[in-house]
Amino acid sequence: MNIQALLSEKVSQAMIAAGAPADCEPQVRQSAKVQFGDYQANGMMAVAKKLGMAPRQLAEQVLTHLDLSGIASKVEIAGPGFINIFLEPAFLAEQVQQALASDRLGVSQPTRQTIVVDYSAPNVAKEMHVGHLRSTIIGDAAVRTLEFLGHHVIRANHVGDWGTQFGMLIAWLEKQQQENAGDMALADLEGFYRDAKKHYDEDEAFAERARNYVVKLQSGDTYFREMWRKLVDITMTQNQITYDRLNVTLTRDDVMGESLYNPMLPGIVADLKAKGLAVESEGATVVFLDEFKNKEGDPMGVIIQKKDGGYLYTTTDIACAKYRYETLHADRVLYYIDSRQHQHLMQAWTIVRKAGYVPDSVPLEHHMFGMMLGKDGKPFKTRAGGTVKLADLLDEALERARRLVAEKNPDMPADELEKLANAVGIGAVKYADLSKNRTTDYIFDWDNMLAFEGNTAPYMQYAYTRVLSVFRKANIDEQALASAPVIISEDREAQLAARLLQFEETLTVVAREGTPHVMCAYLYDVAGLFSGFYEHCPILSAENDAVRNSRLKLAQLTAKTLKLGLDTLGIETVERM
C-alpha cells in the first residue's frame, strides 16, 4: 500500500471541500522529524495565497473536512499552516499484517507500461572499462525496479557496433590470417585494436584497403558481414562474463547496436528534407534549431548527413527514438548516458518531436550521471594513468573482500568464503555507486566501500543476516506466527513499522526519477531503525508470547524488505557473515 498516496487523496478531498480548486496539490510528504508526525501536508501555503486567506486559517478549515478515522491517531496544525499526521498504531499493525501476507509485501501495481531502458552501451572490439560501470548498474537497478512494479521493460544495450573502424579491424584480422576469430580473447582484441590502428596510421596501402573494406561492409557484402559479426560476437561473449559477475540482467538478446538503425537513415534524411526541417548547407544536410544557439546567437546547425554521404550519431539517435516508439511501442524511454551527452541528446530529440516521430505524450528521459573519480578528485585511472578495465576492478574487489572475510572468519570453508567474498566484493562496488545521487560525481574509495559501518553494502548485508539470526535463535512455530496478531504499543515499534510501510513509496520514487540512491537511503534507515528497535524492544525475551510474536513479525517484515530492496538494486544477500 502507498500510504502517502492514500493521505494525499484524503487531504486533497478535504482541501476541495474547504474551497480549494479541484487541481490543488496537498503536498503530502514523509515527515523529516518524529515530532512532526509520520507525514506532513505542506500544500496550504500555495493554495491559501490563491484564495487570499492565511494558510493557517485554510488548514483549520481543511481539518474540519478531513476524515482520517482508522488511519491517524492525531492530526495537528503546526507553524504557518503545516498539517502533521500521526498514524494510528492499529492501522500500522493491520498494514504490517497485509504486507507479510503478500509476496510483494503489499506493493500495488501501477498501470502497466512498455518502458525501454537504454543502458551499458559498450563498444565492439574494446574491453569494458570503469566508465561503463555507472550506466550498467544504475540502468539495471531501474530495470529491476520497473519490472518488480509490473511494467513491461525492454532492455536496450546500444552497443557501438558500426563505423569506419571496422574496415581497419577486418583488414588487420585478414592480414594476421586469424580466420578463426572466435578463439580470440578480448584481452588479445584490445592489443589487436591498437595494432590495427597503428598500421592504419602508418601504412597508407593498409589504410586504403581498410577504407575499401568499409564500403564493402556497408554495402552488405556477405564475407565482410561475417567478419564483422565475428568481432561483435567475441566482444559480447566477453562482456557477458562481466555482466554475469556484476549480477546485471543484460543478455545477448538485449543488444540493439547502432547497426540496427542503418537501414532507416537514408529514409529519415529524405523525410526531414521533405518536411522542410533539413536543408543543404555547404554540401552537408543540416537541421537548424532555434532552441539551441551558436556563439553568434544564431540557430545552431545540427548535421545529419556529411558531404561524403556519411551519417552521424545524431542521425542514428533520431532513428533510434523513432524505432523505440513505432516498433517497440514504448510508452516511456529512459536513457542512462553520462551528462556530457546531454546537449547532443536534446538536439536529436528536438528534431524527433518536430518531425512527429515520437508524440509529446511519450517521455524521452535522459537520466544522466556524473563521473567516478579517484581520491585525488580526478577521473579514476590506473597508477600509470591508463583506463581501468572493469574486469580488473572486479578482480581487485574480490581479492580485497576475500582478505576481509577470511580475517573475520578464519575457519570458514574455502567454497563458502569464495561465495561470501563475491557477494561482499561485487556488492560493495555496486552499492558505493548506487548509494550516491547519480547526477553527481563521486570518489571511488576502497576503504569506505568495504567498511562494515555506514551506508555500505557490507553493512547492509550484515544488517540482513543480523535480522535472520533472531529467527535462528528462536524456536518458532511457523503456523502460530502466521496467525499471530501484530500489536504496536512502543514508539520504536511504530517508527519501524511506519518506515517499513514506506517501501512502495520508495519504489515509486526510484521508478519515476531513476534514482537508486533513494532506495539505498531508505534501506539504511530501515536497518538503523531495526537496530534501535532490537536494542530497546526485547524480542525473544519479551514479556509474553503475544508481544514476542508481534515483534518477530516486525523482524520478519524487516528481513523481507531488506532482501527485496537490495534485490531491486542487484545486490546479493547472504544468510550468514
Curated annotation (Swiss-Prot):
It catalyses: tRNA(Arg) + L-arginine + ATP = L-arginyl-tRNA(Arg) + AMP + diphosphate. It is found in: Cytoplasm. GO terms for cellular component: cytoplasm. InterPro entries: aa-tRNA-synth_I_CS, Arg-tRNA-ligase, Arg-tRNA-synth_N, Arg-tRNA-synth_N_sf, ArgRS_core, DALR_anticod-bd, Rossmann-like_a/b/a_fold, tRNAsynth_Ia_anticodon-bd. It is an enzyme of class 6 (ligase). Gene3D superfamilies: Arginyl tRNA synthetase N-terminal domain, HUPs, Isoleucyl-tRNA Synthetase, Domain 1. The keyword Hydrolase does not apply. One of its GO terms (biological process) is arginyl-tRNA aminoacylation. Keywords: Aminoacyl-tRNA synthetase, ATP-binding, Cytoplasm, Ligase, Nucleotide-binding, Protein biosynthesis. A motif ('HIGH' region) lies at residues 122-132. Monomer. HAMAP family: Arg_tRNA_synth. This is Arginine--tRNA ligase. The gene is argS.
